[in-house]
Regions:
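Amphipathic coiled-coil alpha-helices
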Residues: 9, 16, 23, 39-42, ...
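Alpha-helical protein-protein interaction elements
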Residues: 1, 15-16, 33-34, 45, ...
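Amphipathic alpha-helical coiled-coil segments
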Residues: 45-72, 80-87
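Alpha-helical oligomerization interfaces characterized by heptad or quasi-heptad repeats on one helix face
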Residues: 14, 21, 25-28, 51, ...
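Short, charge/polar-rich alpha-helical segments
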Residues: 1-21, 30-32
């Protein structure tokens, strides 16, 4: 893979990670404020969109997928917290 292409992919990975962190911050805030609908939105956005995109980018570089696994564990913990709080 060309260096320039690799550099762009690495930059996009960092951007995705920042976006995931923003959604995690918002999710934690919504759970603490007992806002179910926005919290569910952030869970879905992280799970269905951002993590898939990150995983695809990591696959392109054939690198370690541990960041995706760490984010999934963190998301599952927050999802369980939300489920117990909203149900």
């Amino acid at each position: 893979m060309k260096k320039q292409r690799t550099k762009k992919i690495l930059k996009s990975i960092e951007t995705i990670k920042k976006e995931i962190e923003k959604h995690f911050e918002k999710l934690e805030k919504e759970i603490n404020e007992k806002e179910e609908i926005p919290a569910r939105y952030h869970i879905k956005e992280i799970d269905k969109s951002l993590l898939n995109f990150l995983e695809k980018r990591l696959n392109l570089l054939k690198t370690d997928k541990s960041p995706v696994e760490q984010y999934k564990k963190r998301l599952n913990t927050l999802r369980q917290k939300a489920d117990s709080q909203f149900n």
